[in-house]
């Protein structure tokens, strides 16, 4: 399988030179269980493309150029090469995530540095053309009279397009999961998580629940809409009773049958494994395993393999996954990769 690698370049204190290319076994094989290798040449040079994602129907990748505060589109011009498509679009300070609407006409960018959510319109070729901010978040705890000195900053971090023309975004600084309908012009309906949890990333589960991992409290929450369409928390557990103080949660991924959830923990450098039970709202911690890297920033599941990006150890490793128990084993393959932050299947 062929993958693209996002990473930090020199402007972000990293060693990458742009978007890289990773191979797991044969490029045309559906399994990622083979030898890992990395192409010496980058797919395209870019400044700290820390998050990358595909257009749903075009051969175009969008990158959050985090330390430049820009979103750039790249068109595929070969199996392992890309070229810029249009000019980069200004987003906001420390833009850290981008997601593309299923319709393919809109990108929404989340900016950790200043809390902005920016809606970027695309033309028919996938080229970014215009940008506009969505409504800014407000700290629900400050509005409720719980003050902080200095005031807590908004930290928009993740965007997820959901069924029924809904978008979910997280605000790590204000402990919010925000739900938007349509293009977001009518504002958001917000779910407030406990103060200091720090919602980071989300995943839509086949059961109809949105799972949200909290970076600061290292928990997993299940959210669902009520019959009136109002979202609410319906379940939640710590990622693991063995998580260490100071751990910071990172990415979420599912086993291919959706029965297990995998959450990265930076600090202890582990992956927490949780089982999804009942109607999807019941979550049970199963195991905490060695991620095989330092700084497990991102991971993806490909059949019976978990690929983990070690941002601080400058490598990607492959963990064998026991699909019966859902528990990954120790790293069986590894390859050097400069400051990797995102692993994206390339086809």
Label each PLM-derived region with a short phrase:
Residues 1, 57-59, 103-105, 164-165, ...:
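Short coil/turn segments that connect the beta-strands within blades of beta-propeller domains
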Residues 5-13, 63-67, 109-112, 162, ...:
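Conserved beta-strand positions in repeat-built beta-propeller and related beta-rich domains
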Residues 15, 48, 94, 155, ...:
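Beta-rich catalytic cores
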Residues 22-33, 74-81, 120-131, 181-184, ...:
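Short loop/turn segments immediately following beta-strands, especially the blade-tip
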Residues 41-47, 87-91, 148-151, 191-195, ...:
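Surface loop/turn motifs at the tips and blade-to-blade linkers of beta-strand repeat domains
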Residues 82-158:
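Asp-box/WD-like beta-propeller blade repeats and closely related beta-sheet repeat scaffolds
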Residues 246-311:
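Loop/turn-rich, solvent-exposed surfaces of beta-rich toroidal or solenoidal domains
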